[in-house]
Swiss-Prot record:
Name of the protein described by the UniProt record: Enolase-phosphatase E1
Organism: Danio rerio (Zebrafish)
Superkingdom as given in the UniProt entry: Eukaryota
CDD domains, A to Z: HAD_EP
The protein's required cofactors: Mg(2+)
Gene this chain is encoded by: enoph1
Amino acid sequence: MAAIAIPENTRVFLLDIEGTTTPITFVKDILFPYIRENLEDYLSAHWEEDECKQDVHLLKKQTEEDLRQNKACHVHTVDQTVHTDEEKAIREVVENVLWQMAADRKTTALKQLQGHMWRAAYMMGRIKGEVYQDVVPAIRRWRHHGLKIYIYSSGSVEAQKLLFGYSVQGDILDLFDGHFDTNIGAKVESKSYENIAERIGCQPEEIMFLTDVTREAKAAEDAGVNVAVVVRPGNMELTEEERDHYRIITSFNQLELIGNV
């Protein structure tokens, strides 16, 4: 695809992760299977540690809330307090976590346990964050010209930092000026992008947001943010109307800093 000039007043790049800096398959094919395959061993190894106990406690609280909200639905319960049988208690937690993952739930309890497991895996070298080859050189070039780089992902800030801190290209956290997750707001709500601009200390129109999801692109655009939609292998197909409306790139290298130097 042809080069695309970014607006001259751009001061900040705001980057999505999944499908933008990182293959969309990384979470589905690497991170989630790691949880499923290693969950029981992880719990057995860390069961008596305070952090693990807190994770299990949150899962138990979530189960109680699920039962209160909809007693008719099938819920895998967690109740480690009544068991002296550690194996049985661990099995209950495993069943609950696998059930939540199969239902594609995003509960705080689930995300916290997953985050702790991924942290251990990254630190042991069992997982490395995948980053497209064009990403790091492009970011270095943008930074050289004085632009700031921020990440905005639905994954937690901690998960973001693990991915980039233990990436296939080494520790590249120094490339980023900050990280945002859904604590700042949902990615499909325009207010979130206004909040980010305010937090960074710039105007929305001074931000260039790169994402593969057009619902996010529209929300950012509605807030006055400039947008480019990233097309990578495995990303959702764009409609003809979307292709006509948005700047489309297949590589960060297509973005030219005309007037920004």
